[in-house]
A protein has these predicted regions:
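Acidic, Mg2+-coordinating catalytic module of metal-dependent nucleases/exonucleases
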Residues: 117-140
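Mg2+-dependent endonuclease catalytic cores in nucleic-acid-processing enzymes, primarily RNase H-like
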Residues: 1-117, 137-140, 144-149
């Protein structure tokens, strides 16, 4: 759903109205942080309204934006050229979001910024894709063998 500042209750209503066959729900680990206005996190509120628990990876690799983006890129095309992520042509929202994902321009002499720009619209689809892939296929710490010369 592409709406700015969508309240969790409205999101739940929209999802339930579509009558999706939901197997799992993946979300932002920050969704479990308590909101003072309701006394619970958005993930807890989502579960209370829909009955579906929100799966969030809490390890440092999955919480890292850069690691998560790298993980998604590996699904888009691995080093050997294999594509493991296929997006249906009817999913126009996520396609638009992926095409609109941007990074800040690098200025000579300044630090390179690794985090993407957040426009509050296109970044949500990309973030949700990252949460889903990191939740379903967790990032594993890679061990490399180094041969001595």
């Amino acid at each position: 759903m592409h709406e700015k500042n969508l309240k969790i209750s409205k999101l739940c209503e929209a999802i339930q109205a579509k009558q999706y066959r939901v197997a799992r729900v993946f979300g932002d680990p920050a969704g479990y942080q308590m909101q003072s206005s309701v006394g619970m996190g958005e993930a807890d509120l989502f579960r209370q309204i829909t009955g579906w628990p929100v799966i969030s990876r809490m390890d440092k690799y999955s919480r890292s934006i850069q690691s998560g983006i790298s993980h998604v890129r590996q699904f888009m095309m691995s080093a050997d050229g294999t594509k493991r992520l296929h997006i249906d042509h009817k999913c126009t929202g996520i396609v638009e979001d992926l095409e609109s994902y941007r990074y800040p321009e690098h200025k000579e002499g300044s630090h390179l910024k690794n985090d993407p720009l957040k426009d509050g619209y296109h970044d949500h689809g990309c973030d949700s894709l990252r949460y889903g892939l990191c939740g379903r296929f967790p990032i594993r710490k890679q061990k490399y063998r180094v041969d001595k010369l």
